[in-house]
């Protein structure tokens, strides 16, 4: 298993690739084209540019998180077939760029939810956490 770090991409992450490169053992990032909307096709040249930026920093791309599945696909609207075609072409373009891992984002609406965004750990660091019992029930 390789140690990787999530990087949101140029202009979307306060942590730079130079900083990530300084973390011992980290040779790759999990990244995305953050500005792309669900259902939109990722063009080969956009993927190549993202890959170039990461590789120029001395890192590799271990995978993509995520090529979002549009709500149009999920509920079968008139745009679903177009979005499915865009999804297929995006996966093909990622494969052609030698990126073979895509994490599927299954979370609806809010993308991710945690009950705490800064739970303090024993060493004083913080991490996101989820405790089901702290959520309101109806």
Report each predicted region and the residues it spans.
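Hydrophobic faces of well-ordered beta-strands that scaffold small-molecule active sites
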Residues: 3-5, 27-31, 61-65, 102-104
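Active-site beta-loop-alpha junctions enriched in small/polar residues
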Residues: 6-10, 32-35, 66-69, 106-109
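Short, acidic/polar
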Residues: 11-21, 84-91
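Acidic (Asp/Glu)-rich catalytic clusters
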Residues: 17-25, 45-62, 95
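Glycine-rich, proline-tolerant flexible connector loops at the mouths of alpha/beta enzymes
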Residues: 33-46
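Surface-exposed, active-site-proximal loop segments in enzymatic domains
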Residues: 41, 68-85, 110-122
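An active-site-proximal structural segment forming one wall of the substrate-binding cleft
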Residues: 81-102, 106
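Conserved small/polar residues in nucleotide/adenosyl-binding loops
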Residues: 131-137
């Amino acid at each position: 298993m390789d140690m990787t770090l999530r990087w949101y991409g140029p202009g979307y992450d306060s942590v730079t690739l130079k900083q990530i490169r300084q973390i011992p053992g980290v040779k790759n990032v999990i990244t995305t084209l953050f500005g792309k909307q669900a259902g939109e096709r990722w063009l080969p040249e956009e993927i190549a540019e993202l890959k170039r930026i990461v590789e120029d920093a001395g890192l590799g791309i271990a995978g993509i998180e995520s090529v979002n599945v549009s709500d149009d696909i999920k509920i079968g609207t008139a745009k679903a077939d177009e979005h499915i075609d865009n999804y297929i072409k995006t996966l093909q373009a990622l494969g052609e760029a030698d990126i073979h891992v895509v994490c599927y984002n299954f979370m609806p609406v809010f993308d991710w939810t945690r009950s705490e965004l800064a739970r303090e750990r024993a060493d004083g660091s913080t991490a996101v956490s989820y405790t089901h019992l702290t959520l309101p029930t109806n």
